[in-house]
Amino acid sequence: MDRVELCNAILFGELDVARRLLDSYINPNFTINGYSPIKMAVRLRDVEMIKLLMSYNTYPDYNYPDIESELHEAVEEGDVVKVEELLDSGKFINDVIYKKGNTPLHLATISKNLDMMRLLIARGADTDVPNTDRFTPLHLAVMSKDIKGIELLLDHRACTNIEDCYGCTPLIIAMSKGDTEVCRMLLDSGANIDYFSKRPCVTAMCYAIQNNKIDMVSMFLKRGADSNIVFTVMNEEHTTLEMICNMDTNPESESVDMLIADIALRQYTNTISSDKGFSRNMTVINSKSRLKDVFEKCKIELRRINSESIRTYNILDLCLKPSKNLDENILARHSRKILGLYDNAIFYKYLLKELADTASQRAEAIESAMRVIDEKITGDETKWNWLPHEIKYNILEYIGNKELDIASMK
């Protein structure tokens, strides 16, 4: 009876009813009068129903072992003209009745055929249809580090938070491959940095800390990953720190120290999102002498950073609120102070890095250009070398880094 009800829900486009039935563990891989649920959805060209069914372990090729499709085969062959002709003749562009449940867009992504991907998307291919393994085209592009393909899919609003059959989002896949560039692209396009996958029971941050991927942890923290967020696993609540300490992980890794540093930072700046999460984290920290020592050292380092100011802004505030960042010339004039804090920082280098890079690059560009100009202008026709150092510096502050570099090379 439930099977008939599912078929009726598909027939009438009742997504909520179909989802309720699938949640009650109905196996969608059956046929009635030669039609499986997925074949019905494809026949009706109901893309949302197709996506729903494919996300519940549907195998479109299970009952059709000798399946063939002119459209899919033309895509595999890279035959753009034939694909256009088939689409013009009415072939369904989001058809999953093929090997492994792949749509034409999946196949174009697998072969990294960017022109074919563009064509299919322009003709209405949905970027978020999962295949049998629940891989969307974005999952596949991330797996193969196809930067151009990833950019194309993200430009067309491919969803960044869909789980595959292993419970992994594209962000978790990119993180597991150590691919900082792709992680950045996904985060820029809206990937949820705190997305909790129930199947592997991890977030991207948890995975990064577990594998001590320092660059990833640094980027996630800078992007706002929440160290005090509470997740529910098997009806039990956990924070990232609790999960890490429950895994086969070295609790003395640099990545764990960075997590502790973020917990201390959120307390210091009064930006705790969850009192419950913070309380649970502090219970763990206070139970381990080394973690407690790290936490106390973090507070000392934060006080030191917060005690230093540039004009009316303390440096910690400048690091935390980029909108308040000062003009790069002002930062350059205080580069020694900023670089001194950066060099002496143990736990908060990731926080100071952008400020330190901006200050040092600008200061070096001005000083380097001044040295070159001083050496090249030896006569007194311009009176350049008569000017005090401060006046020269003020003049060069009006010139951008790129132009200063060009001037230095001439």
From Swiss-Prot:
It comes from the Viruses. PROSITE patterns: ANK_REP_REGION, ANK_REPEAT. Pfam families: Ank (PF00023), Ank_2 (PF12796), PRANC (PF09372). Coiled coil: none annotated. InterPro entries: Ankyrin_rpt, Ankyrin_rpt-contain_sf, PRANC_domain. Keywords: ANK repeat, Early protein, Repeat. The keyword Repeat applies. ANK repeats lie at residues 33-62, 66-95, 100-129, 133-162, 166-195, 200-229. PANTHER family: ANKYRIN REPEAT FAMILY PROTEIN (PTHR24203), PROTEASOME 26S SUBUNIT, NON-ATPASE 10 (PTHR24203:SF86). This is Putative ankyrin repeat protein FPV240. It comes from Fowlpox virus (strain NVSL) (FPV). The lineage of its organism: Viruses, Varidnaviria, Bamfordvirae, Nucleocytoviricota, Pokkesviricetes.
